[in-house]
Amino acid sequence: MTIRHHVSDALLTAYAAGTLSEAFSLVVATHLSLCDECRARAGALDAVGGSLMEETAPVALSEGSLASVMAQLDRQIQRPAPARRADPRAPAPLADYVGRRLEDVRWRTLGGGVRQAILPTGGEAIARLLWIPGGQAVPDHGHRGLELTLVLQGAFRDETDRFGAGDIEIADQELEHTPVAERGLDCICLAATDAPLRFNSFLPKLVQPFFRI
């Protein structure tokens, strides 16, 4: 796997600081599980953060703080799940959300053979899986906020470049594009958005509220 499109420094910093929403954190974590370069960059940021923590003066804990933390840890301890065969298209950070196989996900048809599955993340940002048949285009659209799209299988092209497995596209309000899945292998992506897309055609606008896109 040759990855050419990586997570930005700003996103990595926010991820390391724990300020990203769950949906965006899921996309970044999944990319890091595939990309040695970005994983090394994230490790360097963690090291810097740890060094700063060591230089910070200690703060006295309130009475009962330790007991509270230990109680939370006890609640989080669960029996290990039985071993299961991993789907190579669903790296570890994503596997907890989708189960054993991507085919078993509850997909919803959007039209033109395109399917989506919204994942159970908290907060206002939405994470979804997209399954786009080879050769199929996603309707042209712009963005009202940030959109991260990570390719898990296949590839797509738009007005900016080609994105293959492991690549991540970062789109903002400046980008309008028409992603087209390459012919052959279906393109499966993990995407996250913090605002509805801005479609240019009437039909996508009409169904947009029902599909939360």
Curated annotation (Swiss-Prot):
Keyword Metal-binding included in the entry's annotation: yes
Binding site for Zn(2+) 2: 141, 143, 147, 177
Induction section of the entry: Induced by singlet oxygen. Autoregulated. Part of the rpoE-chrR operon.
Positions annotated to bind Zn(2+) 1: 6, 31, 35, 38
Gene Ontology terms, MF aspect: DNA binding; metal ion binding
InterPro entries xrefs: Anti-sigma_ChrR, Anti_sigma_zinc_sf, ChrR-like_cupin_dom, RmlC-like_jellyroll, RmlC_Cupin_sf, Znf_put
Cystine crosslinks: none
Cofactor requirements of the protein: Zn(2+)
Record note on what altering residue 38 to S does: Loss of ability to bind zinc
Effect after changing residue 35 to A: Loss of anti-sigma function
Required for response to singlet oxygen, as annotated region: 86-194
Cofactor details (free text): Binds 2 Zn(2+) ion per subunit. The Zn(2+) bound by the N-terminus is required for anti-sigma function, the function of the Zn(2+) bound by the C-terminus is unknown.
Keywords assigned: Activator, DNA-binding, Metal-binding, Transcription, Transcription regulation, Zinc
Recorded phenotype for the gene knockout or disruption: For single chrR mutant about 12-fold increase in rpoE-regulated genes. For double rpoE-chrR deletion mutant no effect on anaerobic photosynthetic growth. In illuminated aerobically growing cells double deletion is bacteriostatic.
Annotated region described as Sufficient to bind sigma factor and inhibit its activity, given as residue ranges: 2-85
Family classification: Belongs to the zinc-associated anti-sigma factor (ZAS) superfamily.
Domain statement: The N-terminal anti-sigma domain (residues 1-85) is necessary and sufficient to bind sigma-E and inhibit its activity. The C-terminal domain (residues 86-194) is required to respond to singlet oxygen.
Physiological role: Anti-sigma factor that inhibits the activity of the extracytoplasmic function (ECF) sigma-E factor (RpoE), thereby indirectly regulating the transcription of the cycA and rpoE genes. ECF sigma factors are held in an inactive form by a cognate anti-sigma factor.
Quaternary structure and interacting proteins, as annotated: Forms a 1:1 complex with cognate ECF RNA polymerase sigma factor RpoE; this inhibits the interaction of RpoE with the RNA polymerase catalytic core.
The protein, known as: Anti-sigma-E factor ChrR
Organism annotation: Cereibacter sphaeroides (strain ATCC 17023 / DSM 158 / JCM 6121 / CCUG 31486 / LMG 2827 / NBRC 12203 / NCIMB 8253 / ATH 2.4.1.)
Origin organism lineage: Bacteria, Pseudomonadati, Pseudomonadota, Alphaproteobacteria, Rhodobacterales
